[in-house]
Amino acid sequence: MSKEKQAQSKAHKAQQAISSAKSLSTQKSKMSELERATRDGAAIGKKRADIAKKIADKAKQLSSYQAKQFKADEQAVKKVAQEQKRLSDERTKHEAFIKQSLSSMRTTASATMEAEEEYDFFISHASEDKEAFVQDLVAALRDLGAKIFYDAYTLKVGDSLRRKIDQGLANSKFGIVVLSEHFFSKQWPARELDGLTAMEIGGQTRILPIWHKVSYDEVRRFSPSLADKVALNTSLKSVEEIAKELHSLI
């Protein structure tokens, strides 16, 4: 039996005893018991109510916590989904970047392979000497199997002239320089000669001068260092003879 029921039972018995008491002292004694039982019952009832209130408060707190936790879980799931989407988008962008980079690398590699094509001879000349000598020399060398960097054959529409010539200079074993009055008056062939000279100093190539209708004094005035080099002379040898001597060097 619970304490509350025990207190109620005592109060009931005390009430009955008061009704049946024959003496005043017995009534007073039972009245005291009734008061104690009533107080005990009230205290127990209050305590039970307090406990019930606490339980209700805890239940309310639990419900509130569960609601907050549910909302937090929803937000966490949403954040995870957003993060997964972000990672997926980043991965997609990264894959696209890698594909683009690979494509660029392939293009660069292809261009590099083309740029690194090697030649036996680079021919530096003035355009005015093409028909009179250079074209025939190139044809004779090609007939002998030599690989020539010659603008009429090597340069294509859209090519960068300066870059292609720099590539030709860098990837040729020998630099043939056709020295003529036209050559001496041109800036572009002179730049090519500067490039060949720098490479010869670096041990990367050799300059092979050909004198075309010029004298020693004219060459010396243009470049004393070239005048001292052993040269082939179009006034002394035919195109075929010059081509054979040049081809013998490779």
UniProtKB/Swiss-Prot annotation:
GO biological process, one term: signal transduction
Predominant cellular place of this UniProt entry's protein: secreted
SUPFAM superfamilies (UniProt xref): Toll/Interleukin receptor TIR domain
UniProtKB keywords: Host cell membrane, Host membrane, Hydrolase, Lipid-binding, Membrane, NAD, Secreted, Virulence
Effect of D151R: Does not affect homodimerization
Region named Disordered: 1-46
Mutagenesis / variant outcome for changing K213E: No longer inhibits TLR4-mediated activation of NF-kappa-B
GO CC annotation terms, alphabetical: extracellular region; host cell plasma membrane; membrane
Residues in TIR domain copies: 117-250
Biased composition (Low complexity): 14-23
Effect the entry attributes to changing R142E: Does not affect homodimerization
Catalytic residues (UniProt): E192
Impact reported for S235A: Impaired homodimerization
Secreted listed as a keyword: yes
Protein task: Virulence factor that interferes with host Toll-like receptor 2 (TLR2) and TLR4 signaling, resulting in the reduction of dendritic cell maturation, inhibition of pro-inflammatory cytokine secretion and impaired NF-kappa-B activation in macrophages. Interferes with host TLR4 signaling by abolishing host TLR4-TIRAP interaction (but not host TIRAP-MYD88 interaction) and its downstream signaling. Inhibits host TLR 2 induced NF-kappa-B activation and TNF (tumor necrosis factor) secretion. Binds phosphoinositide (PtdIns) via its N-terminal domain.
Subunit record text: Homodimer; may also form oligomers. Interacts with host TIRAP. Interacts with host MYD88. Interaction with host MYD88 was not confirmed by another study. Interacts with host TLR4. Abolishes the interaction of host TIRAP with TLR4.
Full protein name: Probable 2' cyclic ADP-D-ribose synthase TcpB
Native source organism of the sequence: Brucella melitensis biotype 1 (strain ATCC 23456 / CCUG 17765 / NCTC 10094 / 16M)
